[in-house]
Structure formats: C-alpha cells, structure tokens
C-alpha cells in the first residue's frame, strides 16, 4: 500500500493519535529538490509533522509551517492541506554532515538550534491562526512537541524519522503524534512514557514494514487503540501556469514592460516542485494588457 495516515483515539478517547507512512511523499520532495541526506531528513521530518497537523483540520483548511534556524540549510517551508496533500522545500538543499554521536543524520546541525518554528492555519475565516515558538533542539520532533505544548496548550509527543539510501533516495519515512485529552490521568501518561522510551526509532519501524496502525498499537497498547480514519497522503503542488500568470499581472505594467523589452520573455521556477514555467513575449503582452 502507498503512503497513508491513520487517525485514532487511545485509552477510551483520552489520547488523540496520528501516525503515517510517508516514504513516497518525502522521496518525491527529495527528488524534486535534489536534497542531500541531512537536508532530506530535515525536510521530510517537517513535511510529516505538517501533514499530521493538517489532518487535525477539517474540510478545505490548510496550514503553512516555517522553520527558521541559524543552520546552513536556511528556512524550511511546508504547505499541508487537510486532504492529505503536502509540499515543501528547503532553502539550501545541498547540505550534508557526518552522522551524529547517536549514529543518526545530524539534523540539528543543519537546521540550527537558535531560531523559530511558526505555523499559520487557514481554516476559511478572515483571520488566520498564527503560532510561533523558539526552536528547542533543531531535531524537529522535539520542536513540534514543544510547539503543541506551548502554542496550543496540548501536551503531546511528536516522533518523525527519515532513513536515506546511499544514492540519496528515501528508504523509509514515518511519524506519529500523540496528544493527551482532558481526563488523561497519571497512569495513562506513565504507560505512554514507558512505551516511548523502549520503542525503536519510527523510521526503523517503517523500514521493517510496520504499518501506521501497528505503530500506534506499539505506542499505546493493542487494546487501547480505536482507528477512526485512514487517508492517503501525497506530495502535491498547487502551482500552475495560470497561477504564475496572475502573480505576474500583480507586478504591474512597468515590471511586465521591463520583462518584455529587456528579456524578451520570462522564466520562473516553482520553489516547491521545481517546475519551470516559460512566458513568451506575446504571452507577456497579453498579461500587460490585463495588468
């Protein structure tokens, strides 16, 4: 089965849980961005966290995650929709370091430990919800955990992991979010904490073929999980030539005239999917008339 996300409840509704397998989604972003392994892990972790956060929304709602650390990869931007479609990019994709002391890709060194994680939610209202927290580790799972606790006042645990092949393709990518609901007592908390301390890295579980449902069972206990929904997830970009044309029109007549006279056309590349859009001199003349 391809990539998908599972929504569930645990401990009779006292825990809200999400888990996903996102190997293909992350690999498509890596392929389009030509990221090197450490940057791939950072981008993939952020995309999976964004995908699970968006799955908490309803209908046509969407969100944007922005991670801005002081590390060499620069900003990570992810757009996720409630329907399971996500896109993302990293400003400097060609960043890679040796493995850290734990034998893992050194995401914190690439992202940096000083900076911010911000989330903008668009739920169809006039005003968007915006939350921002400082980075606490740069490893990203811990940073999203802190975001939920600090910005949304929801005690949570976030795990996201990416394994990268020697040829830079993605071997496995997966993640989970566990959130305590009102009524979760100390016994539930200690049970979850005990399981979190003993479970292998989530990327290893995905590599071994463990589906999201079984990952949640391992995190919460077989008898404590009630699956609510499964939904497919994918890398998807909403860019189009029409959308780029509207952006060119918004630049105004002077800018468009300069493109026509100085360049004889225009070429633009989407940050997210690296699709290249070309506009001929004649097409720009038409846009000039509409501006």
From Swiss-Prot:
Alphabetized GO MF terms: protein folding chaperone; unfolded protein binding
Disulfide bond entries: 237-239, 270-273
Alphabetical keyword list: Chaperone, Cytoplasm, Disulfide bond, Redox-active center, Zinc
Location in or out of the cell: Cytoplasm
Superkingdom of the organism of origin: Bacteria
Modification after translation, per record: Under oxidizing conditions two disulfide bonds are formed involving the reactive cysteines. Under reducing conditions zinc is bound to the reactive cysteines and the protein is inactive.
BP GO annotations: protein refolding
Keyword check for Nucleotide-binding: no
Family statement drawn from the similarity comment of this UniProt entry: Belongs to the HSP33 family.
Protein function: Redox regulated molecular chaperone. Protects both thermally unfolding and oxidatively damaged proteins from irreversible aggregation. Plays an important role in the bacterial defense system toward oxidative stress.
NCBIfam families: PRK00114.1
UniProt-recorded name of the protein: 33 kDa chaperonin
């Amino acid at each position: 089965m391809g990539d998908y996300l599972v929504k569930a409840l645990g401990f009779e509704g006292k825990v809200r849980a999400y888990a996903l397998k996102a190997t293909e989604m992350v690999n498509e972003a890596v392929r389009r961005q030509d990221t090197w392994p450490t940057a791939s892990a950072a981008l993939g972790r952020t995309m999976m966290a964004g995908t699970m956060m968006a799955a908490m929304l309803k209908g046509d709602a969407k969100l944007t995650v922005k991670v801005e650390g002081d590390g060499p990869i620069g900003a990570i931007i992810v757009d996720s929709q409630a329907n399971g479609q996500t896109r993302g990019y990293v400003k400097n994709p060609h960043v890679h370091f040796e493995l850290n002391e734990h034998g893992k890709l050194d995401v914190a060194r690439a992202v940096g430990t000083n900076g911010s994680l911000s989330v903008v939610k668009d739920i169809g209202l006039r005003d968007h919800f915006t939350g921002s927290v400082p980075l606490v580790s740069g490893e990203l799972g811990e940073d999203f955990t802190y975001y939920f606790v600090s910005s949304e006042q929801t005690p949570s645990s976030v795990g996201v992991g990416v394994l990268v092949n020697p040829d830079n393709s993605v071997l496995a990518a997966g993640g989970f979010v566990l959130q305590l609901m009102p009524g979760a007592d100390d016994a539930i908390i200690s049970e979850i904490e005990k399981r979190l301390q003993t479970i292998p890295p989530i990327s290893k579980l995905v590599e071994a073929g463990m589906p999201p449902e079984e990952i949640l069972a391992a995190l919460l206990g077989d008898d404590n999980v009630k699956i609510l929904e499964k939904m497919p997830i994918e890398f998807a970009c909403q860019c189009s030539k029409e959308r780029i044309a509207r952006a060119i029109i918004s630049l105004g007549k002077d800018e468009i005239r300069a493109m026509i006279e100085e360049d004889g056309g225009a070429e633009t590349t989407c940050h997210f999917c690296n699709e290249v859009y070309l506009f001929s001199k004649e097409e720009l003349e038409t846009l000039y008339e509409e501006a």
